């Protein structure tokens, strides 16, 4: 995508009467009771392994947006490779359900990768991550020298879908 695509999509959303009707409770928020105080925007490039968004199951009640911070661009490229070559496969095996993955190209947090996953509920999410941490493939991957020092920290933001959510 480019800036032209961004503007076309934005106009398409604003022209979508179904979207606008579903979002009306959000649009009706007032200053004393805002939906948010501000928001951040990121431009991300999709990973080769998951080049487009995957739609979550309708049973989802929990999304997790994770950000992995790297010390420099080279370490970040190795983290992207780690996901593309190995890590996403382990996610699939243990029930960490993918929506999208991206390398941050522009935004307030760089260098970094971000990805969104979904779960039926919090206990299901916790069980999937326990399986991930114990999985033999992860135990092997996390100790490979080519993936050493790829992320300095990670953060998670937990989200709940609203009636007007497109996912």
Region roles according to the model:
Residues 1-138, 147-167:
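Short S/T/G/P-rich N-terminal loop/turn motif that feeds into the first structured element of a domain
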């Amino acid at each position: 995508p480019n800036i032209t695509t961004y503007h076309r999509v934005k106009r398409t959303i604003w022209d979508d009467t179904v979207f606008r009707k579903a979002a009306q409770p959000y649009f009706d928020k007032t200053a004393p009771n805002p939906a948010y105080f501000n928001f951040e925007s990121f431009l991300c490039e999709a990973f080769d392994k998951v080049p487009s968004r995957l739609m979550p199951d309708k049973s989802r009640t929990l999304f997790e947006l994770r950000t992995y911070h790297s010390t420099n661009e080279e370490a970040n490229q190795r983290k992207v490779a780690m996901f593309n070559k190995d890590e996403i496969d382990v996610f699939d095996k243990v029930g960490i359900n993918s929506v999208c993955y991206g390398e941050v190209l522009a935004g307030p947090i760089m260098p970094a990768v971000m990805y969104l996953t979904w779960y039926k509920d919090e206990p299901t999410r916790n069980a999937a991550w326990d399986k991930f941490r114990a999985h033999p493939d992860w135990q092997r991957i996390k100790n490979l020298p080519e993936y050493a020092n790829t992320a300095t920290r990670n953060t998670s933001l937990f989200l709940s879908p609203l009636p007007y959510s497109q996912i």
